[in-house]
Amino acid sequence: MVLWYRNVHDYQFDFETVTVAFFNKYPNPYASHVQSVDTLKREIKEDGKLYTTRLIKKNGKLPSWVKPFLGKISHSWIIEQTVIDPKTKEMKAYQRNLDHTKIIRVEEYTTYKFNDQTETTNVNYNVKFSSNFQTFGVKNRIEAWSHNRFKENTQNTTKGMAYVMARCQETIWKKKNIQV
């Protein structure tokens, strides 16, 4: 069985602020589980879009019933690929775990799109949870636990982004006042 988590959210910020915050969201008080973020590649291609690949190391709290399968491993590596189209004010992000994929594979597809009418940035999350674990009953349990954990953490993701966006705007405001 494969589980999907879907969610939408509107940030009351312009597209530029949201995308700057996205690439600067770590560290923040709501993401203490993120240990490191490394930019592997960033380039503007002929189509005028910005392409970025990052590697993220996260710590995780696992339920006791999973530990026999993973041992003492408490972290995971995530690859993140993003494409920003400045003309359409849209960013697409794809994240997936690089390790523990036989136990659980988590793939996150996120679209950020500026809405000219409401002057907000709409975010559409689609997250796929799939396990290749063959032990009877464990596969569905792992997928369900991962799905529920992601759903619980969504609130912290939103708070973390809002925190970083407010800091971005504060920095911009300070720079404008210095120039006056």
Report residues per predicted region.
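Short edge beta-strand segments in beta-sheet-rich domains
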Residues: V34, W77-I79, E107
